Each structure stands twice: as C-alpha cells, then as structure tokens.
C-alpha cells in the first residue's frame, strides 16, 4: 500500500535516498517524505508526487547523510496532506518512523500516550509508533522497538531512526513486506527489491515477527522476544523494470496474486469478539437499524460486487436491496425518501456517474455509505460514512484485488446489518468464521495457476464465450465475462443459467464455449441440467466447481475446482480463477492486459 526505503552507510547523498524512493512510485501514492541524519537531523515531506518533494530539496540533494528513511504514502488514516505524510516524529523530534500497514489499536495507544503527556500533530495511526518508541527508549533503539511492537495490533512494516544513533535503522515486519540487503558500504531496506538492485542483488526477506537492526556492513534479525533469527539470503536475477512488478510479467498478474493479501487488508481490524466491527459506523448504526430498504449504485465490476451484496442480504434478512447501474440511476426519478440509505461503490472514488447518483440521492435526503479504495477521493469526501477497501494501489486497468477487497467489505457490512437488525444467528457466525479463514484458501486457489494457464491455452482462439451461473454464481459469471472482454477483446456474454432456454441457447455450437460457474450450493443441480443442455448442443464446456463434489464427475469437460466454503462466499473463492483465465488468454495472445484498448482505470467522465 505504501513504499518504504531505508539507507545507512558512508558517502550517501540525499539524492540517493530520493532516487531509491522513486523506484517505488509504481505502487501508487498521494504524498512522500524523508528523514535523514547528516550534519543535522531533518524531516521533509509533501503531499503530491516525489518530484514535488525533490524540488523542495533541490538545494540539499548533494548533502551527505549517514542514515535515512523515506516513504510514499497511500492514505488509510487521515486525508492526504503534508501533516499526515510520513515520516512521523516523537515529541522531542529525535525519532522518525515510516510505516506501511494499519495499526488496529492506535486509538487506545494514542489515548494512553496522551495521558502520559505526548502531543500528536497528525491524524494517522503511524504517529503512535514514534511516540511509543519514545516512551520506551532508554538509550537502546532495538530494545525500544522490541517493546513497542509488542503493543501493536494489526499489520505493519516499519523503519525507525534516532538522531543519537547515527549508524542504525531498526525495522520490523508483521503482515507487510520488507526486504533488505548489503551493498558496498551501504545497508538498504525497502518494501520490495526494486530500490535494492542498484546496490546489491543478494537480499533477505523479513518474515512476520522479525525485527532487524540494519547497519552499513551487515544486519541482525531478532524475533519480538529478542532472540536472534537466521534468514536465507536470496540472489535476485530481476532487472529493475521486472522488479517493479515483483518479477511478474504484468501488473495485473501481480495484483491477482495479491488477492489474498487484499482480503487480509480489507478484514484487518474489522472483526472484534467474533462479530463484524466497523469503527467508521460507530456513530451511524442508526442509519442501518430498522432499514426496510437499501439502495446500491455502482458501475462495472463494482456493480457485480453490489449484486453479491444484494443476494447476501436478501437471503439472510427481510431487507430489500435495490441495485442499479449508476449511469441509469442518475437519470431516473429517484424513489428516495428522507433517511434512506444509499451505498455507493467505487474503487477510485471518482467515477462520474456514481458521484452524480450520490449527489442526486443526497438532494432527496438519502444518507450515503460509500465503499472506496482511495482515501480523500471525491466520493469519500461527499459521503456520510466511508468504508475503505484498503486494497492498496491497483495499477492494472482491470479490477482484480480491489474486487476481492470490496466483496470482503460488503460481506462484513451485510453481517453488521444482520447483527444490528436482530438477524444474527449460528449461520452468520459460520459465515464470518469462514470469511476470516478465506485468505489461506485463496492461496490454495492461486496454486492452480498452471492448470488455469493450460486451460487458457486450449481456449484462447475461440471468438465467443457464454458465462452462466445461478444465485451467487451469476455475479461471478458476469464478472468473468467482463474480465474476458476487457483484456482479451473476445466477445463474452453472461446469463442466469435458467435463461438459456429463453433465447441464448440458440447461439451455442461447437465454436461457442460455455463457462459454467457452479459451486456446490443449493442450486447446483439446476445449473448442472443447464450444462448438460449446453453439451447437447455440442458446446465446449468449462466448469468452475467445488472440490469433493462427486456429481461433477458426471460432466465431461474441463473442470477447475476450488475449496468448499459457505455458499454465499463462493464469489470470493472463485474470483482468482476467472481473473487468471482471462489474464492468461490475453498474455498468450500477445496483448497487454495492464493497458487494454479504449479503457481507463477511473471513468471520470460520463
């Protein structure tokens, strides 16, 4: 989500630190900053591009420093501005910290530290780390960081420097990546290997719970109890361009592989005492209590995620959920009354039609709950409540990990609505438990990548596809068809499986494959009959089904299995498969899936 760089050594110039930080620009960010110790201890940070930061430092770029840390920020707590940019400092301005991740218990820590006399200058969760290290510091920076991280809950990668410790960076990792290496007279760490490659190709990847002491000539790694750890050194053969993509050929491929982490990021801090928890909704639960109808507006992939939410909430409550494509809603007479709830979903928070739909709904008295990935975006600012996806920057035009993240937030929101309206039961407990366990299962799904690529090779030359599904399988079919259209330019259409006989089946023949989304759910046998109908028209069939479902054995065709889960969660479980199938076809056809023709990442015009 953010980018971290740390350097310690001799003969280093500030330009080296800034240039290394620029190697992380591809990750996306809204502000940047550095802290450095040379002839003096300084911090400089600015909202905007690294070029803005660099321009402000232009008189100092040739200044020498001994130790420095740098950061690109993607806002999660506090809007994007100079004050909230990293690094953050302690009260004495002796300690500087950069951080990637989310500190779940930062409010409790902040209250404790304020009672101890600490004064805060930002709205971020990160600043508590600097003050916590200050609170624990008694001359040993490692010891202070070890004590501090034991009090943190959530995900983090941090790098800490102290003005009185000129030869050391202390770094720690839990849930967010950090990699380090030693070059000629320089120790360097970063969020990924890209900034390291100018100095060394021999690197060590920190593991969860690791705390590292980095110096110019070496490093030590400890666990949080202060016991030394051994970590393998890897030799990296990537060049810098490949390293930006983590060694993957395309950003889209990398971002699909980040689906499990995106799910973790969306869930972190949002489950307490085995119940869904949204700090953002603390003062707005009345909005969702006793609601008899909820409206949803969104576009594209976000619309399909909204459909999943509709099915989920209507299957588990008596609440009606009406969902419309934003470009239609904004031009209709809105049947909205004072106090109605409208949920707006947009990765960028800048989708023009969704913004206009929100403005129309607000004129009629609706309260807006938005689900957004970009903090400080227009939709964020114009909403009553914003629930962030926390997926981090997504570079590829086609939504992948943000689809997973918005689904996760919508499931949690649905469960929260169930809880506050008296629908909480043992099945809700089961769904939440399986949702929390889902990241590990998504890792298992991604291990099927070679099989999916083989299937893509087999089907890449077809010119038409029909995706079908029932219930929760239908939004997945819609999203699968959209992915294929977006990046392969193959015509793909999606239907409710029960609609085949009402017209679409006339299209099917040996040159028109059917991609059937059919998890082992209450509608499985209905969908199975539609697949058999399709095969009787000689259509090639791909089935996306569930491991252990022996009824799939009766279907001859290509089958991809995913692990079993609660039937409402299959859209999450199956997302990586439909993404990888489309990605590999695009790649095998020699297309660039990161930049499909005629498409933009954020649709900011009508």
Swiss-Prot record:
Q: Supply one GO BP term.
A: fructose 6-phosphate metabolic process
**Gene3D superfamilies (alphabetical):** Glucose-6-phosphate isomerase like protein, domain 1, Glutamine Phosphoribosylpyrophosphate, subunit 1, domain 1
Question: So which domain of life are we looking at?
Answer: Bacteria
Q: Which GO terms describe its cellular component?
A: cytosol
**Keywords for the protein's UniProt record, in alphabetical order:** Aminotransferase, Cytoplasm, Glutamine amidotransferase, Repeat, Transferase
- Subcellular location per the Swiss-Prot or TrEMBL entry: Cytoplasm
For the protein in the UniProt heading, the enzyme class is transferase
The Gene Ontology terms for molecular function here are:
carbohydrate derivative binding; glutamine-fructose-6-phosphate transaminase (isomerizing) activity
Catalytically driven reaction(s): D-fructose 6-phosphate + L-glutamine = D-glucosamine 6-phosphate + L-glutamate
Family matches, as Pfam families: GATase_6, SIS
Residues forming the SIS domain are 284-423, 455-596
Look up the EC number in the record and give it: 2.6.1.16
Task: Identify which residues the record assigns to the active site.
Answer: 2 (nucleophile), 601 (for fru-6p isomerization activity)
Q: Which cysteines are cross-linked by disulfides?
A: none
* CDD domains cross-referenced by the UniProt entry: GFAT (cd00714), SIS_GlmS_GlmD_1 (cd05008), SIS_GlmS_GlmD_2 (cd05009)
Its predominant location is: cytoplasm
Residue ranges occupied by any Glutamine amidotransferase type-2 domain in the UniProt entry: 2-217
Recorded hits in NCBIfam families, A to Z, give:
glmS, PRK00331.1
Quaternary context: Homodimer.
PANTHER family, per database record = GLUCOSAMINE--FRUCTOSE-6-PHOSPHATE AMINOTRANSFERASE, ISOMERIZING, GLUTAMINE--FRUCTOSE-6-PHOSPHATE TRANSAMINASE (ISOMERIZING)
Function in brief: Catalyzes the first step in hexosamine metabolism, converting fructose-6P into glucosamine-6P using glutamine as a nitrogen source.
The name on file for this protein is Glutamine--fructose-6-phosphate aminotransferase [isomerizing]
Q: Tell me the lineage of the source organism.
A: Bacteria, Thermotogati, Thermotogota, Thermotogae, Thermotogales
């Amino acid at each position: 989500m953010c980018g971290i760089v740390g350097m310690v050594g001799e003969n280093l110039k500030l330009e080296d630190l800034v240039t290394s930080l620029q190697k992380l620009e591809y990750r996306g960010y809204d502000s940047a900053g550095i802290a450095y110790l040379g002839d003096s201890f300084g911090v400089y940070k600015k909202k905007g591009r690294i070029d803005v930061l660099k321009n402000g430092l232009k008189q100092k770029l040739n200044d020498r420093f001994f130790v420095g840390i740098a950061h690109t920020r993607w806002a999660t707590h506090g809007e994007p501005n100079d004050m909230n940019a990293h690094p953050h400092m302690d009260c004495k301005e002796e300690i500087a910290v950069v951080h990637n991740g989310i500190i779940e218990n930062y409010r409790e820590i902040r209250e404790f530290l304020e009672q101890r006399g600490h004064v805060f200058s930002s709205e971020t969760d990160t600043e508590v780390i600097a003050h916590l290290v200050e609170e624990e510091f008694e001359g040993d920076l490692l010891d202070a960081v070890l004590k501090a991280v034991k009090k943190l809950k959530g995900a983090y990668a941090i790098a800490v420097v102290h003005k009185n410790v000129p030869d050391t960076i202390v770094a720690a990792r839990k849930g967010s990546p950090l990699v380090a290496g030693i070059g000629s007279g320089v120790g360097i760490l970063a969020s990924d290997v890209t900034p390291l490659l100018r100095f060394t190709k021999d690197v060590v990847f920190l593991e969860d719970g690791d705390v590292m002491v980095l110096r110019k000539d070496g490093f030590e790694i400890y666990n949080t109890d202060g016991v030394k750890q051994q970590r393998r050194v890897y030799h990296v053969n990537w060049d810098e361009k490949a390293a930006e993509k983590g060694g993957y050929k395309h950003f889209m491929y990398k971002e699909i592989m980040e689906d499990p982490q995106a799910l973790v990021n969306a869930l972190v801090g949002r489950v307490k005492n085995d119940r869904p928890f949204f700090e953002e909704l603390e003062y707005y639960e009345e909005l969702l209590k006793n609601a008899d109808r909820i409206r949803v507006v969104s576009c594209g992939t976000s619309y399909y995620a909204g459909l999943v939410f509709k099915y989920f909430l209507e299957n588990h409550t008596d609440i009606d959920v009406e969902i419309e494509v934003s470009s239609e809603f904004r031009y209709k007479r809105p049947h909205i009354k004072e106090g109605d709830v409208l949920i707006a979903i947009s990765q960028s928070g800048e989708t023009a039609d969704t913004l206009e739909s929100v403005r129309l709904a607000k004129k009629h008295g609706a309260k807006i709950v938005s689900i957004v990935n970009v903090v400080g975006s227009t939709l964020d600012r114009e909403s009553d409540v914003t629930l962030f996806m926390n997926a981090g920057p997504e570079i590829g035009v086609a939504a992948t990990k943000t689809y997973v993240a918005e689904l996760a937030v919508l499931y949690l929101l649905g469960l929260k609505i169930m809880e506050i309206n008296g629908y909480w039961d043992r099945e809700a407990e089961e769904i939440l438990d399986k949702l929390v366990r889902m990241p590990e299962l998504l890792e298992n799904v991604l291990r099927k990548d070679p099989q999916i690529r083989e299937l893509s090779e087999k089907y890449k030359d077809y010119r038409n596809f029909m995706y079908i599904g029932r219930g929760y399988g239908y939004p997945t079919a819609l999203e699968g068809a959209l992915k294929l259209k977006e990046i392969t330019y193959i015509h793909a259409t999606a239907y409710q499986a029960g609609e085949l006989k009402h017209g679409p089946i006339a299209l099917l023949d040996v040159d028109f494959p059917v991609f059937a989304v059919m998890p082992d759910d209450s509608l499985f046998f209905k969908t199975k009959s539609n697949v058999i109908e399709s095969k009787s028209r000689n259509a090639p069939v791909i089935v996306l089904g569930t491991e252990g479902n022996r009824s799939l054995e009766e279907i001859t065709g290509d089958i991809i299995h995913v692990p079993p889960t609660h039937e409402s969660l299959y859209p999450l479980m199956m997302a990586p498969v439909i993404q990888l199938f489309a990605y590999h076809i695009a790649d095998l056809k020699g297309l660039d899936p990161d930049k499909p023709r005629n498409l933009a990442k954020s649709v900011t015009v009508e």
